[in-house]
């Protein structure tokens, strides 16, 4: 019994040491991605809230920095997919690249940008299905989120977009509902990223549709988005 216990302890110690070594190996790319995102986020917000001669809300220069911040997360996801080239990881990396493009497009044409983001969520959703097939928790989550979209989001859209199309926004909300429901059985870091993405988009809807104003509000919305993308990318390095 003592010998078996010692073998068990030795096995646990080796597993823990291997896990620690793996995390240490990833500290540098994780840190570089995070620092890069913070830096470009700060530069972008500095440009974002400055008036520009074109009359647009965002200058093209500001959009470059906005995209670069997301690109830092995409690079981290690509690194994780390179280390572990599984279909789920490769789809996450693809989704991050798509979202990087969507980030820039959103500032030029909101509707097209929203559609491209939808494609990014499709890539995320496919990754989740391959990584951990949906079960009862995902089904319950989807039904609850769908009910919220139909009974809460759609009436809200009709109120603030009187006389204007609500279908594109409702469809995007359903895509988010599917993505978040499929994230329920995934790694905690991935679920957290999916949740923060939805929270950020909810705040963005408040700003774009209900015209909620304020620099702090906009900065928190964007910060949640970048944190979401960072966590999704970091999940490719999680055990």
Label every PLM stretch briefly.
Residues 23-239:
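Polytopic alpha-helical membrane-helix bundles and their juxtamembrane interface segments
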Residues 9-22:
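Short, Lys/Arg-enriched N-terminal segments with co-localized hydrophobic residues
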